[in-house]
Amino acid sequence: MEKLRVFELRDKSDAELLKLLDDLKQELATFRVSKVTATGTSKLSKITLVRKAVAKVLTVYNQRKKEEARKKYKKLSKTPLNLRPKLTRAKRKALTTKQLTMKTIKERKRAENLPKRKYALLA
């Protein structure tokens, strides 16, 4: 079991990734059995390699699925919570620019009818 490279995994299709994932999980299961039966202590160090390989495959697969979901929901007005950008609570609750610029009727009338005063300074 050599170390997996992520850039190589990105070129593979979903079916190939899932097949590789099944193979890695089978291999991990055999290593765990050999660990319990204490036959072949040389295989113990390979458990970490296989676990990390499983994590890499799952990461590539999940990133691809999330990207596809983002493309699907890009045109729609509402997106699921897990596809929205991660923000702090304060930024999520903050007013939008439209809400910030809104004025009451009284403020609008005052701005229309009473222009801003201009002062000329004599030097």
Swiss-Prot record:
Please name the Pfam families in this protein's record: Ribosomal_L29 (PF00831)
InterPro entries registered for this protein in UniProt:
Ribosomal_uL29, Ribosomal_uL29_euk, Ribosomal_uL29_sf
Protein's GO biological process: maturation of LSU-rRNA from tricistronic rRNA transcript (SSU-rRNA, 5.8S rRNA, LSU-rRNA); translation
GO molecular-function term, one example from the UniProt record: structural constituent of ribosome
Sorted UniProt keywords: Ribonucleoprotein, Ribosomal protein
Q: Which Gene3D superfamilies match?
A: 1.10.287.310, 6.10.250.3450
Name the GO cellular-component terms. Answer: cytosolic large ribosomal subunit
Keyword field contains Ribosomal protein? yes
Q: Which family does it belong to?
A: Belongs to the universal ribosomal protein uL29 family.
- Give the HAMAP family listed for this entry: Ribosomal_uL29 (MF_00374)
What the entry lists under PANTHER family is as follows: 60S RIBOSOMAL PROTEIN L35, LARGE RIBOSOMAL SUBUNIT PROTEIN UL29-RELATED
Its protein name is Large ribosomal subunit protein uL29
Q: Which organism is it from?
A: Theileria lestoquardi
Taxonomic lineage is:
Eukaryota, Sar, Alveolata, Apicomplexa, Aconoidasida
